Amino acid sequence: MNLVERFAEAFNRRDVDGLLGCFTEDANYRDLFYGPHAGQAALRGMFERMFREGRDYRWQMDTIVMDARRAAAEWTFSYTATAAVPRSEGRRVRFSGMSVFELGGGELESGRARAYREYADTGVALLQLGFAPESLAKVLSRRLPTA
C-alpha cells in the first residue's frame, strides 16, 4: 500500500496516529479549511479538531499519480458536520479536489510526506455548510490575487 492509500485509510478510520505515521516529524501540511500546520504536534491538533467537528468521513482517492519524489491524487471527500460546528450541525458536505504529497526520503511505498497541500473549490463546501452567499463572497474575496 502506498503513502496516499495509507493516508486515506487512516483518515477514514479517524486514526490520528496512523495519519501522523504518513508524515515526517517536521512536515508542513496546508489544509484548505484549517490552514497551514507544521510539525507532528500541530498536525495532531489539526486532525483531532477535524474529527471533533465532523463525522462519517469518506475520503476516496479516485486517481493517484506518483513518482519517486511526489504523489498527486484526485479525490472525493465527504463528511457530516457535528455539534462542534453549531451553524452547520448535521449538514452533509461533499466535494472534489486534489492533493500533492512531497516525499521525505524519496521512497513512495514506505516513505513519509514532508509536505502536503490540497486544492478544491471551497465555495461548494461552504455553501453546503450553510454559509450565506454574502458571507461566502466575503470569505472568498480574501483569496483574490492582489496586484
Question: Which role does the model predict for each range below?
Answer:
Residues 16-20, 24-70:
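A solvent-exposed, acidic/Ser-Thr-rich amphipathic alpha-helical stretch
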Residues 15, 38-39, 121, 132:
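Helix N-cap and loop-to-helix transition residues
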Residues 1-22:
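Short acidic-aromatic low-complexity motifs
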Residues 4, 40-43, 94:
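A structural signal for well-ordered alpha-helical scaffolds and beta->alpha junctions
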Residues 11, 27, 114-117:
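Residue-level recognition of hydrophobic positions within alpha-helical transmembrane segments
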Residues 48-147:
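A beta-strand edge to alpha-helix "cap/lid" segment located at domain peripheries
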